[in-house]
Amino acid sequence: MTFKVGLVGCGRISDIYIENCARFEGVEIVACASLDLDESRAKAAQHSIPRACLVDDIISDAAIDCVLNLTIPAAHADIALRAVQAGKHVYSEKPLVTDVEDGRRLLDAARQAGVLVGNAPDTFLGGRWQTVRRLIDEGVIGHPTGVGAYVGTHGTERHNPNPDFYYQPGGGPLLDLGPYYLTAMVFCLGPIARVASMASRAFDQRMIENGPRNGQWMQVEVDTHSLSLIEFESGVIGSMMISFDVWDSETPRLEIYGEEGTICIADPDPVHGANIFGGEVLYRTRDTSRWTHQPRPVGRDSWQVAQCHHGYNVNSRGLGLLDLALAVKEGRQPRASGELAYHVFEVMDAIAVSPAAARCQDVMISCARPDPLPVSFPDYLT
């Protein structure tokens, strides 16, 4: 039976979702809606979606199984709550909500309605992060002991013609990029117990440097540089730097340290790393390490490259929606679940609160560590 999806939000990101869903077996986008009906009609015509309509039409249509919620972050909670109250499953773009209480209300309503909530990011379901998880589960680096994530850009004003919301409440690098890294960490290392952080903003205003608004100034209302310490329930400790105030960097995007080795995600591009589904996974072990010897060993300049056995190594946005559709059929929770997204959001909320509180913040909402995808999971995008 086809899992029928109604799309709400027809912005730029919707294209890759629509294109991928058209290739997923058993999933069909049957209607699309936005605040602007003309925009909905244009999107439907562009992708041959059967119906363009209003948001209320999708919420009330009994033939639609799931709402794909690609609205702006401030609207995520409202659209998702309306969907579950109408008896529909929902899959939303990140973040799940912009307020902790909204997240609790949404998940409670979903449980009462007997429907599932899924949420981006789903990049951790891609081949790269499944490979990282395999290395950990197979004991290649031994018991994990630490993790470091480093992502710094200089914001979005050079390539996005309307970047204002990135610098308004609900935006900023923590909520924009943090979900990718924190979700990958939780997938690999389990839920987070507490955090401590410092934050700053380098500029009170930023200039838009592209498009029809080139040269216009916008106010910066959120912190744009965050440095966090993270303690996991397992005892692993880590750090995360995430910033819109960095012009360039050579730091790896993420490293996981274990008793017997290191896993490295070495991408120089700050919008790669945990933001993408594929890519190299490098590792070293006790036997191939460089810096534990004097004099330094010869012939160990290159890292070992892990073999990837999993699919989805291209831009696979919507993979979490496919897994949600299968979860409905199989009677289980989706891997990119609302509970996972809620935990990650509470972690980010604690990180945001910590600088003013000047102390560690406990994370009150835990979650299950998502299961890896089986190697046999069908790859519809290659």
Predicted regions, residues:
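N-terminal Rossmann-like dinucleotide-binding module
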Residues: 1-47
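Core-facing hydrophobic residues within beta-strands of well-ordered domains
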Residues: 27-29, 64, 144, 192
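Glycine-rich phosphate/pyrophosphate-binding beta-alpha loops
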Residues: 241-249
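Beta-strand-loop-alpha-helix segment that lines the small-molecule cofactor/substrate pocket
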Residues: 66, 72-73, 77-124, 139
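Short acidic low-complexity segments
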Residues: 50-60
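C-terminal glycine/acidic-rich active-site capping loop/insertion
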Residues: 204, 208-214, 218-221, 227, ...
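Short glycine-/small-residue-rich Rossmann-like dinucleotide-binding loops
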Residues: 63, 71-72, 242
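Predominantly a Rossmann-like dinucleotide-binding segment in NAD(P)-dependent oxidoreductases
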Residues: 123-219, 358
